[in-house]
Amino acid sequence: TTTTFLQIASSRSGRALLTKETGISSPKLLHWARRAELMKIKDLGRDYADLLEAVGVESVSELRRRNPESLHESMQKINIKAKIVERMPSIKRVNRWIEDSQHIEIKVSS
């Protein structure tokens, strides 16, 4: 499950074990773990996570530091070019993601 994956992949030693067992690189596992942690935020699914990644937000800690208006504007600009999502999230939703990110316990370490 995602929960089990996060428990194991949240640490370097866990990722090393997974790399040994699966052959998947540690950086790829770290990316997936950060993505899974980010997707714990309500209404933030895969497509929106892809859009956030396109503007440089790849983790909960990065989302926490963002200004909602600037982030929303960057997301709009990228989405016009790359067409990542069909429906842009509202500024209210982006603001809620940032607020909700404050309450997510970050377990994934670099």
Predicted regions and their residues:
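C-terminal extensions
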Residues: T1-S110
